[in-house]
Amino acid sequence: QPWCLYTGKHLFSFVDNHDVVRAYTALQNKDKIFNMYAILYTMPGIPCIYYGSECAAEGDKSDNDYKLRPCIDDVDKNKRPDLLRFIQKLNAIRRSCRALSYGRYEKCVLSNKYMCYKRELDGERIYCAFNISGENVTVRVEEAEGTDLLTGEVRNLNDIYLPPYSVKLFRKNI
């Protein structure tokens, strides 16, 4: 990609790690966590989840890093079961869609409240749409129909309706 400094490389990507404030702690609006992980799993790169983050573990980098690295037994694994299920689903989707791991990236729509891009490889096209606002939005992509990878529903993709803070992933075989 012309915008990419490391063209052809598969770089390691993360939203938090042992050196920075945990993602769930950093977010003022916790509803945005789903967008964060969906972007991590669908953008170019190799996604990495720092242990405990799949369960919404919190940790602030104050005087030292100890709060960022709790004993795994101390992480509340039932805090956000919806987040854990969502990340498991993203793992399965990424494994089943080669375009998400190796495909080219192309921006479709970009604003400060929502965005849509596509990943494409060998006849597989994945549309990734995100709404980070508290308002309903509709994204136009000019495509016939595709399969919603999160629900399995087959639908028309001309207008993708995005409720507040939502993620939609669609596969279009071309």
Q: Where do the protein language model's features map onto the residues?
A:
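Loop/helix patches that line or flank the sugar-binding groove of alpha-linked glycan CAZymes
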Residues: 1-143, 162-164
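Short, solvent-exposed coil/turn elements at secondary-structure transition points
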Residues: 54, 78, 152-153, 173
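Solvent-exposed beta-hairpin/edge-strand motifs
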Residues: 142-152
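C-terminal beta-strand-rich structural cap/linker in extracellular carbohydrate-active enzymes
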Residues: 156-174
